[in-house]
Amino acid sequence: IDVSTGGGEGAHGVQARAGQGEAYPPTPTTSFTQPIGMAATFDRELIRRAGDITGKEARAFENAVGKSGHCRLAPTVDMCRDPRWGRNEEGYGEDPYLTGKMASEYISGMQDEHNYDGTPIVPGGRGDRIRTGAVLKHFYANNQEYRRAYDSFDVSDKVKYDYELEPFRYCAQEGHAEGVMTSYHE
């Protein structure tokens, strides 16, 4: 197994800039409208195409620089339930169904799963090769600002299962996300 390198942000395209602990020059990449704006279109194909370009640029960056292309920290699947949360623009809104479906399309575009031998993937199945891995953010209920790195954010079971976890389920089952970034909860 070859060495795998972590990635940078990718919520609305590949973030490939210097000064974040990486020793490479700034690299021009495509920057899309923030996910909250793209989700407002309800256009799943648009989201998939944005993910496709993000995945291609991440892989090209990995091939050229040798860093940060094997995975990207995206999409943000947190629910945008409080307008004071400073990262609402990274999410897809306050509806778990819309968020799950849109984020799954972005993942599918980024990862571009396929089989080494060229055979098609069975619908709903997994390929044996991906372009770049999607890492979901932030599992789960990470949408509070005050003391978010220190306090646990507790929710009722109904909110937990019907609201907060639902988009993550879509992303795991339909999008086949490769990883999950956790939040700070107990």
Residue ranges of predicted features:
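Glycoside hydrolase catalytic-domain context in secreted enzymes
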Residues: 1-186
